[in-house]
Amino acid sequence: MNAKYDTDQGVGRMLFLGTIGLAVVVGGLMAYGYYYDGKTPSSGTSFHTASPSFSSRYRY
């Protein structure tokens, strides 16, 4: 019973840290697209296509 609880605790902590890490990465990419959108129109085409910014979404 105690080992099962420890396993669940570890999995929950791993998912929690993974979620935080993913949020940090997504936030960093969004900030990069926001600050550098329009400054480097020739680079990062695939990223700008998936960027939430409206100005970069219609740039092809």
UniProtKB/Swiss-Prot annotation:
The keyword Membrane applies. It is a single-pass membrane protein. It is found in: Host membrane. One of its GO terms (cellular component) is membrane. The keyword Cell division does not apply. The chain crosses the membrane at residues 14-34. Keywords: Host membrane, Membrane, Transmembrane, Transmembrane helix. Residues 38-60 are annotated as: Disordered. Residues 40-60 have a biased composition (Polar residues). It comes from the Viruses. This is Uncharacterized protein 004R. It comes from Frog virus 3 (isolate Goorha) (FV-3).
